[in-house]
């Protein structure tokens, strides 16, 4: 911590760093014009940056330049149990690697406070219509994840600065919003803005509090945990002015789905967004959090709101201590982060979004930005032909378009009291009119916080949700993360036998193909009250605005408008029922972690038969060998919008998959296969998930008529034999054949899972060439020593007529964003050898990334640094 510009903070016993003065000393009048993000980044530079580069780094912010890297030191790391666990498995493996070479393994410790919340492990095996669902689901979670939870318990005693919130307590982002983020930190007598990175792409949830919170992969999180700076260049900072006021009956979910569509079209990929204007000013923090949560869905890195009175009211409402709330207000006003101090902020680009034009929406059938107004469902071909569906229902059959899953799920919506209370009020009115859930609908309610249950019970609507089948099944991610659990066997068999077009409706944040459930062919995102309405309707063919949900006792038709609660009803009940005491009752005991014994050994005692936790291989064998970048074969040629769900799916493991066959061989019963996500601590299981998504289109796998065959398939060259992806990977591994992947636009969008990069690296992939990369996945590729290259504008796999028979090499000097040459060697139709030289851009974006890549990845770099004594 530096000393220059360190001053007493008026009205407290604390000190702070006067970033305003530091900036004004360089350029008078500049500070007031800085965006919120730049002010926070400038403060941490003044507080922690090497004085030798401080002025240059501040000038980057003042002059809006992107010429030089500067360090970012996040104050905290938050993890969920999937990526958080794999990060700690990596650190445990790093300890072993260091011990094997004579080093001291106990030196490997997080130095930045790290909080791990177990929230990704629970599958909804029992739906919300079972009164004992919560206890049953938790018991199954504990049984299936005993290996994982044993390791996580060990980390609490083996590593310093690691706190664990065990399973059954809520979702990481919601707990971060409601409790963990102080907004303003107080450490060593110094006040400064809270910042954090999290091992999940929805970490920006707490941007709603004015806290820069960024989703990263597990590898980058490990880097931050160990006290390394996260080097960056000034990001694009875009102002988003929210004008107008929402129409009656419009939820924050409707707004965020419309915003996601709008911002995707505006191409804000990688940018830090700052929301302001009358629309932002009038929003509660709950509504703001719904918007910030879906940052990755519109492609941005952060979605900030200024600190204002609404922030202060929320901190008070959620039970923060009065002294802490006072510190947030006084510090924000002192340093110029208060909303009224941001009126002079200048943005190089400002977008304008009118809240008054937002209608009731859903998104689907397979992308969060594919918004559909509920008024247009028939015109879009989603609703319609309801008579046929109802005729099937009358015959005792599951109807066309059946909603087989209806889930109120996800921190996106369950951290917003207005949304959950609205669902409860709609359920109450539906019950009063005699409406019921259709029997084939697996309904569930999984709030991200125990506080939600307390205020819904206080509001008197929890019992109404339970009556309609939306009892609480868990406090975890569940369906939103693809952990929707098994269907009733008879329902599943009918779907298979009749090839029923079945769907899911959920209040989550993602609906990529194959993510929610293997037998839900498509999925739609909707607000919590709409989820309840669709459970009553029972089919997506139902026009939610105009079709009748049923009849009352007098035979009169009931429509959505008849049960939709008014804004006044919702707001009055929220005001009456949500209280600080509820949050204190939940969080005070949860965070009373007490004293912990130190582990007897710094080395983990690996269980050889475990399919969940295994010593990682990253410092040995082929991964320790240099990459050739020569004579590479393509493993896959892929279209636009490849997601990390395509690259390494998270959902349930099926018996006929490569991972399922492996688990069966290891003696695991099929009912305990669990999800791909839960096995990511064991590379032997997890690598079999690489490209295991049945919805994948590998353009190398074509039918005789030239159409692309869907599935987890690859074509092995030079033989041209098509086989399952995992068998192709094994074939190439046995041949020690280096591989390449060719892709289209927006490669790697979606979840921040590092196994989307680890899997391809273990497969032998050395290079990925795409038209564009999503930020987190590109960083993960670098962290695994995979070289990301970007086609120049106007060049792509189609213009080059690539078909997968080629050999590829890369030549040139690897440097940040340097020009390299992709050399493509192939045979022409007349049997001649053709060589094409394709200019590409090296997407190692900083000098630090070049160093990491040259070391073979961050894990190899860590080992080198610890053995050489270059620890943080």
Residue ranges and their predicted role:
Residues 1-872:
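Fe-S-dependent hydro-lyases/dehydratases of central metabolism
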